[in-house]
């Protein structure tokens, strides 16, 4: 069985990354929110009462990436050099893709996953009035398949 690097003697701790090489790191994560067709059309046409859903979700994702160490206890504060947030609008869903780049000593996959999660939660928050049923619940709204698409580590070469 593989050992967890952040657990020692049944106690969680932050892994020491000070001896790791500084390299360029990328991670891309993706996830989807399922919505009513009518809600997706309102997002597409810009007809959501709370405002521009995707612009707000993009901003929320970027802020979430930068705040990941405040939310996930064992994440290191690392220099984020780039965040790119893209959305794909389907018939009854919206997919969020977040790519994070850093030059540092540890990966950025948790930052990318956090960005996707908060983007999708923001979309839900902005359209929840259109998604509720007559009891105030969300029987068909769902966030799904949040996962890392790719993680890359590149050696820095002096030019």
From Swiss-Prot:
Catalytic activity: (8S)-3',8-cyclo-7,8-dihydroguanosine 5'-triphosphate = cyclic pyranopterin phosphate + diphosphate
Pfam families membership: MoaC (PF01967)
Key words, A-Z: Lyase, Molybdenum cofactor biosynthesis
EC identifiers of the protein: 4.6.1.17
Chain sites annotated for binding substrate: 74-76, 110-111
Database matches in InterPro entries: Mo_CF_biosynth-C_arc, MoaC, MoaC_sf, MoCo_biosynth_MoaA/MoaC, Mopterin_CF_biosynth-C_dom
Pathway: Cofactor biosynthesis; molybdopterin biosynthesis
Superkingdom in the source lineage: Archaea
Keyword Thylakoid: no
Enzyme class: lyase
Keyword Disulfide bond: no
Gene Ontology MF annotations: cyclic pyranopterin monophosphate synthase activity
Catalytic residues in the record: 125
Similarity remark: Belongs to the MoaC family.
Function as written in the Swiss-Prot or TrEMBL entry: Catalyzes the conversion of (8S)-3',8-cyclo-7,8-dihydroguanosine 5'-triphosphate to cyclic pyranopterin monophosphate (cPMP).
Subunit structure: Homohexamer; trimer of dimers.
Entry protein name: Probable cyclic pyranopterin monophosphate synthase
Organism: Methanococcoides burtonii (strain DSM 6242 / NBRC 107633 / OCM 468 / ACE-M)
Gene: moaC
